[in-house]
């Protein structure tokens, strides 16, 4: 029993000694960003906005992340141990705008069925023709176009950026028969850079739409009514 107690005490002293040594050799790094409202994280924990003091314990490393919507995320690991550069006293990060974000707009019309009631003074054939004309001015390839069932689907249009791949397509289907209406959906999805347009499992819905397509829903709505 005495041996067990002594062992526990020695282990506790050892832990305290190691912790003290780590804190004794700690380094402080004042991190700042070009964007004053960017969030700064240290090992996944938010530690400041725009500027923060990062503690790097002896014989350890810290991963710094800086994030702001519309900008590329910054990530860097700073180590305070042998074989690595000495942690700087200050570290300034210049954030770069996100090219995919700049080339797009946020909209509640993305990935949503928008019902468009057709003008009763126009025949269904005329409305279908107008619909196709509008869509083909934005999309080069239509995979399926069936007026009888009121279904149309374009092929994916892919646009790549340094940090992301964006694919966009249009889907049209019958909404109601009396009065006749179509449901129009602009599908917008995002994946990592250099992703094949066919890699469905790597894409997810995006609440933004590339500026190239920002007026397509409005055109369909205004010209078919």
Where are these regions (language model features)?
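Bacterial N-terminal signal peptides that target proteins for export
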Residues: 1-10
